[in-house]
Amino acid sequence: MAERKGTAKVDFLKKIEKEIQQKWDTERVFEVNASNLEKQTSKGKYFVTFPYPYMNGRLHLGHTFSLSKCEFAVGYQRLKGKCCLFPFGLHCTGMPIKACADKLKREIELYGCPPDFPDEEEEEEETSVKTEDIIIKDKAKGKKSKAAAKAGSSKYQWGIMKSLGLSDEEIVKFSEAEHWLDYFPPLAIQDLKRMGLKVDWRRSFITTDVNPYYDSFVRWQFLTLRERNKIKFGKRYTIYSPKDGQPCMDHDRQTGEGVGPQEYTLLKLKVLEPYPSKLSGLKGKNIFLVAATLRPETMFGQTNCWVRPDMKYIGFETVNGDIFICTQKAARNMSYQGFTKDNGVVPVVKELMGEEILGASLSAPLTSYKVIYVLPMLTIKEDKGTGVVTSVPSDSPDDIAALRDLKKKQALRAKYGIRDDMVLPFEPVPVIEIPGFGNLSAVTICDELKIQSQNDREKLAEAKEKIYLKGFYEGIMLVDGFKGQKVQDVKKTIQKKMIDAGDALIYMEPEKQVMSRSSDECVVALCDQWYLDYGEENWKKQTSQCLKNLETFCEETRRNFEATLGWLQEHACSRTYGLGTHLPWDEQWLIESLSDSTIYMAFYTVAHLLQGGNLHGQAESPLGIRPQQMTKEVWDYVFFKEAPFPKTQIAKEKLDQLKQEFEFWYPVDLRVSGKDLVPNHLSYYLYNHVAMWPEQSDKWPTAVRANGHLLLNSEKMSKSTGNFLTLTQAIDKFSADGMRLALADAGDTVEDANFVEAMADAGILRLYTWVEWVKEMVANWDSLRSGPASTFNDRVFASELNAGIIKTDQNYEKMMFKEALKTGFFEFQAAKDKYRELAVEGMHRELVFRFIEVQTLLLAPFCPHLCEHIWTLLGKPDSIMNASWPVAGPVNEVLIHSSQYLMEVTHDLRLRLKNYMMPAKGKKTDKQPLQKPSHCTIYVAKNYPPWQHTTLSVLRKHFEANNGKLPDNKVIASELGSMPELKKYMKKVMPFVAMIKENLEKMGPRILDLQLEFDEKAVLMENIVYLTNSLELEHIEVKFASEAEDKIREDCCPGKPLNVFRIEPGVSVSLVNPQPSNGHFSTKIEIRQGDNCDSIIRRLMKMNRGIKDLSKVKLMRFDDPLLGPRRVPVLGKEYTEKTPISEHAVFNVDLMSKKIHLTENGIRVDIGDTIIYLVH
């Protein structure tokens, strides 16, 4: 039962969503054609795209978060009257799908079908996380395949497929790559449709040569790029098998599928004379220990160099005659990268053990230490890097731990012959400031985690995890030349600086071990390949021009683009393995996935007219155009304004229709993506648009919005920990609108965002409550107040609605969706709740329905299904998808401020009343609780008391002189302290200054005004009924502070009224209800001087909560006040011998004699000690 209760509201929302989606589908709301729109372009068009997701699995919440930004933007721009297009393609190009299919095929060959795998234990994952593994990899260079990223925890592909819930019969089909293309794309579309995406699905397609139209489009793009000299042929880094003598692609690998080359900066540490005895035979040669680092930006902080005493090293001769010292394994890699005279040959000149070069003196680039020494580290591994490790103890936990070991342990130094002067003088050098960790992050974290030595592997792994990612994304450089710049922006610049100075080289090795099928361990080699020459000066210059005019919504994104344009060189655009389009002039090569995805947004504009609603482009073409007819000249005509009409059998009006679509929709108004795509895909996107339309800058991208990664409940999303949600799971759990609301609330900046499940649950409740309230208002239309909407609270509410429209409009415009949700839903609902509470005379019908309409429109981009449903409840004939953004009326800021003032005063009075009722601490009081006050006088000040007036004048003077800032308290205190008129009040002055400063931050400069902008007394008097009811008092009066005693006059200031509570004395009477079986009881009540029927009934209602309506209660008195109450009541004769009390009658109380008289029409009557009340 409880379970059902838990899903009722979600089920309600999901039911609405299903109905609304069918309605949109039937009405084809999101299908748009340029030919129909050109007549109505007064407000312009809006074309938005999202990087098509890769089709080797279901879409997850991370994808959904990024694409929600497109979705919300389109929803908003539709309301602003623009013609909106949001198309959605699906990416299948590249190696992962083919590699997975081939892996399955191989498992079936080896182990049968279904496979019977051996019971051998899976390789144990290394628990110690090596420094390099946590560093942010440069995704444009060493791009880990998505297959590796999504492999889950199973060693076998069959197991991975099984974890997706597939049966053995279904899994077999996935051994053919084509089946992946049939299976996952329809599921992606199904999931996205359930989300309610505003997509024109006719324009969707999958990539690769499976779709002949898209294939033809990519071939055209590459022929054009080659024609324009953007594509070159030459050496590029690739995984290579020396034994096989050729590149080793995924399908040729025994292990290491999806592994790519990893780029290091190879640091040259020059050995100084006198050389260690083992190297003495090489006198006259330049000898370098070469260290591979992923963190060139930290090299300013080198204090020493590490080698492992018991590891074998070699010295080999490089192509220019220098000697490099490193491991044999690293030298083998280098020999295929142009380091040696002959490719693949390592000319060894010396074999040595690490201990034989300990204590050698070195000169290292960038560091402030002139000489550093080779010291022992016992944890260096042979399988990564060069076996030589440069030491930066300021930023590497491993290095500070090992250095402290040597400093603390004299015996350890003695064992390896290390002198004190080689270790003790060397202290960590501040290089990077990391928020929360300071400028020596490794020192801080090692102290925090109490790391004792270099053998605390687990703690060191934790330390690295905590500081490396944060350092990359948030670290700020402290060294000259780069001071104040972000690490991620200067990493490449510093690397280039060292390479240009001859102090470093680029070195590559495989990210992980790769074994070829011939059981050969692969290396990274320079091999001939086709590449895009992104480093070419003119191309870079033009792309920089494009970037200048690009809206990035955030400075960090722009800096990231600028940094990328600074270091980006060649990008290999061809592979020999995988799925994709073949290079038109060299068919053995396939175009890789980061290269066929740069201008496909142009294909969206015409796809629906070419491929007939079929993802594979295999259905009949709506224009009757065959793929073979789409020659290079035809594509030129469609996409290039000046291109002549081609020789073709296609009718001119058909090609003009394609051209019209492109000209109408281009350029792309917004592209949204995760920030990790800025250094690769998004930069290539700019480059390729500039290359394809060099003379037409009006076709270049207009805006790019990059967002942070999505956390789930404040933790990283991960399948292995179970903290993971697919898109379809999220909709099942929260409904589409519930999920969308939480996505909007997750975050706006390039910092990590957070999807909080509790927020999604709370959102569901809010949405459900909101629609129920709307239904209630529609049902109670007649009972809502009509006539002029002119009360104080009517006018405040109207102003708050208009202010909400304006603020929310600005937030949507800037794509600050979390803020738009705050101003357009949370604060908007709060304004309604406040109005409902304050409007004691009832809410105004016109305002209530204006509010519902405006709220529905402001929320529609986030929760379109529910808003469409409410739109229908309001009796609107058309879809909300065709509605317009609400028009904001005038905003009376003064009125809004006065309402805020009213809420603050009410809050303060409640607190003061609570304190008044609490007995003073330390005083012995009677056990009797304090009696609640009945009356209150509120004192308001027209002007500040003289001491506050003087203080404020001083503050305002400083504020205006300091460009809107106040100086330190010391400065203010010394000036105020020297003023004779303030001497007496100094104890009060600084607390008053502190209050003003605090309010200045919240409310702005108006807090320094010497008078309020509204009439304080009038605001309180207009709301006196609300205040009286809210505090449950009998009566409140409002007076000026000038009428009060000195203490109040001195402390009362504008905007901060003071008050006095009191108990008005009265005489107690019995209030008796003689009606049988109605649940109303008899009670005692105080009657006070001047009371009338209304005040007594209100007092009764506070005691008898069963009475809801004042007008339903009548009071009567006994004709005989003495004997009447003593007679036994007779059923059916409740009114006998009693007289109704008129509402005009006034009660007079004689406190001395404890008697009460009633005065009515000049007649005075004694009422005794009992009154009758009747409830009808």
Swiss-Prot record:
GO molecular function, one term: ATP binding
BP GO annotations: cellular response to amino acid starvation; cellular response to amino acid stimulus; cellular response to L-leucine; cellular response to leucine starvation; glutaminyl-tRNA aminoacylation; leucyl-tRNA aminoacylation; positive regulation of GTPase activity; positive regulation of TOR signaling
Region (Editing domain) residue spans: 260-509
Result for mutant: residue 245 to A: No effect on leucyl-tRNA ligase activity
Subcellular location: Cytoplasm
Annotated motif 'KMSKS' region, positions: 716-720
Listed Gene3D superfamilies: HUPs (3.40.50.620), Isoleucyl-tRNA Synthetase, Domain 1 (1.10.730.10), Valyl/Leucyl/Isoleucyl-tRNA synthetase, editing domain (3.90.740.10)
UniProt record similarity statement: Belongs to the class-I aminoacyl-tRNA synthetase family.
Role, per record: Aminoacyl-tRNA synthetase that catalyzes the specific attachment of leucine to its cognate tRNA (tRNA(Leu)). It performs tRNA aminoacylation in a two-step reaction: Leu is initially activated by ATP to form a leucyl-adenylate (Leu-AMP) intermediate; then the leucyl moiety is transferred to the acceptor 3' end of the tRNA to yield leucyl-tRNA. To improve the fidelity of catalytic reactions, it is also able to hydrolyze misactivated aminoacyl-adenylate intermediates (pre-transfer editing) and mischarged aminoacyl-tRNAs (post-transfer editing).
Record disease entry: Infantile liver failure syndrome 1: A life-threatening disorder of hepatic function that manifests with acute liver failure in the first few months of life. Clinical features include anemia, renal tubulopathy, developmental delay, seizures, failure to thrive, and liver steatosis and fibrosis.
Subunit structure comment from the entry: Part of the aminoacyl-tRNA synthetase multienzyme complex, also known as multisynthetase complex (MSC), that is composed of the aminoacyl-tRNA ligases for Arg (RARS1), Asp (DARS1), Gln (QARS1), Ile (IARS1), Leu (LARS1), Lys (KARS1), Met (MARS1) the bifunctional ligase for Glu and Pro (EPRS1) and the auxiliary subunits AIMP1/p43, AIMP2/p38 and EEF1E1/p18.
Designated name of the protein: Leucine--tRNA ligase, cytoplasmic
Species the sequence originates in: Homo sapiens (Human)
Lineage: Eukaryota, Metazoa, Chordata, Craniata, Vertebrata
Name of the gene encoding the protein in the UniProt record: LARS1
